[in-house]
Amino acid sequence: MSPQTETKASVGFKAGVKDYKLTYYTPEYETKDTDILAAFRVTPQPGVPPEEAG
């Protein structure tokens, strides 16, 4: 019989959903010559804020 080990939930990552607004904009990002600009038209479903639909 193998020994049991204790697993801690706080190790690795914290479960949950972050507000999208907190993760999609990075003001300190500097563009590179290899960056590609792409544009898409997205229509949010009813009840979804436009900034989260993209």
Swiss-Prot record:
Modified residues (N-acetylproline): P3
Its biological purpose: RuBisCO catalyzes two reactions: the carboxylation of D-ribulose 1,5-bisphosphate, the primary event in carbon dioxide fixation, as well as the oxidative fragmentation of the pentose substrate in the photorespiration process. Both reactions occur simultaneously and in competition at the same active site.
Gene Ontology molecular function terms on file: monooxygenase activity; ribulose-bisphosphate carboxylase activity
Cystine bridges: none
Protein's cellular compartments: Plastid, Chloroplast
UniProt-listed Enzyme Commission number(s): 4.1.1.39
Something else known: The basic functional RuBisCO is composed of a large chain homodimer in a 'head-to-tail' conformation. In form I RuBisCO this homodimer is arranged in a barrel-like tetramer with the small subunits forming a tetrameric 'cap' on each end of the 'barrel'.
Keyword Acetylation attached: yes
Gene designation per UniProt: rbcL
Keyword match Acetylation: yes
Positions of the pro-segment in this chain: 1-2
Catalytic activity: 2 (2R)-3-phosphoglycerate + 2 H(+) = D-ribulose 1,5-bisphosphate + CO2 + H2O; D-ribulose 1,5-bisphosphate + O2 = 2-phosphoglycolate + (2R)-3-phosphoglycerate + 2 H(+)
Protein name per UniProt: Ribulose bisphosphate carboxylase large chain
Family designation: Belongs to the RuBisCO large chain family. Type I subfamily.
Coiled coil stretches, renumbered: none
UniProt keyword terms in alphabetical order: Acetylation, Calvin cycle, Carbon dioxide fixation, Chloroplast, Lyase, Methylation, Monooxygenase, Oxidoreductase, Photorespiration, Photosynthesis, Plastid
One GO BP annotation of this record: reductive pentose-phosphate cycle
InterPro entries linked: RuBisCO, RuBisCO_lsu_fd_N, RuBisCO_lsu_N_sf
Positions carrying N6,N6,N6-trimethyllysine: K14
Pfam families referenced in this protein's UniProt entry, alphabetically: RuBisCO_large_N
Group of enzyme by EC: lyase
Gene Ontology cellular component terms for the protein in this record: chloroplast
Subunit record text: Heterohexadecamer of 8 large chains and 8 small chains.
